[in-house]
Amino acid sequence: MKKLEIGGLYKHYKGTKAKVLYEGFHSETREPLVIYMHLEDGVIWARPKEMFLGNVVVDGKEVERFQQIEQEILIKPSSN
């Protein structure tokens, strides 16, 4: 299984970006979970780790559900 980076940025196969906040466990099943935040709207989600790091089939091609991306430096241009 691929390694998960806490604090890492990931791009969902549909194009949204997310930041991994924590790794946790389901309280009843002890299934490993990934807690992450969508950068576009700030909503926090939990997904099974195996699913987060797994693949999906899109147009007959297998792709990563979340692909790790480089940190982006976002600088707001000055209004001078």
Q: What is the role of each PLM region?
A:
Residues M1-N80:
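Mixed-charge, low-complexity intrinsically disordered regions
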